[in-house]
C-alpha cells in the first residue's frame, strides 16, 4: 500500500476522523511513540519475552491455579514466566534500533503528512543550566498541516554504554497554511543529559561534546549542532 492509517482508540468520533483524513478534509499529524520492527526477533528484549509457548506445561498451569503470581513461592518461580530480567538495560525501544542501526519498518517518531515542512537553521544558547533551542518551521507544501518537531541528543566519545541518541524534547506546531512559518522553541535542562551512575547511586553528567539534533523522526534528522559542556 502507499500508506497505512493507524487509528488507535479513536473513541465514538473515531470513524468520522478516519473519513476526514482519508477524504483530505484533515491532514494527519500524529507520530509513532514506538518503533515498528522488520522482525520480532530484532527486539533486544525478544529472548526474554514471557509466556513462550514451549514453556507452558501442565505443572505450570496447575501451579498458577494454586498460587496467584504474586504469591508463588520463590522456589517455584520460573524465569520469563513469573519474573523477567531486563537484559536490554537502557537500550529500550528506539535506543536499541538506532544504536545498532537496524533496519526497521517504521522508525520512532515517524508519521506521514499531506504536506512538507522546511526547518530553518537552529539557534542555540546555554543559560542557567538550560539549553535553549529555537528554529522556524515552514509549510512548503500545498496542504495545511501540523508538524511534530523532535529534539535528540548524542554524547560524543562517551566513556559509558549509552544510546546513540535520545529524545529530550518535542513540540507540535499549530495548523500552518501554505508558506506559513512559525517559531518553535524548547528548553532542555542540562541535567536531562545525565546518566544514572551506579557507582555513586546518583545522576552524573559527562563533560565533553554533545550533538543536538532536530528532525521529523529518529531516522529523519535535518540538522545537528555540537555543544561543549
Please report, for each region that a protein language model flagged, where it lies by residue:
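Composition- and surface-driven signal marking solvent-exposed, interaction-prone regions
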Residues: 131, 147-152, 163-168, 198-203, ...
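Terminal connector regions
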Residues: 189-229
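Intrinsic-disorder/low-complexity, polar/charged segments enriched in Ser/Thr/Lys/Arg/Asp/Glu/Gln
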Residues: 130-132, 181-185, 222-224
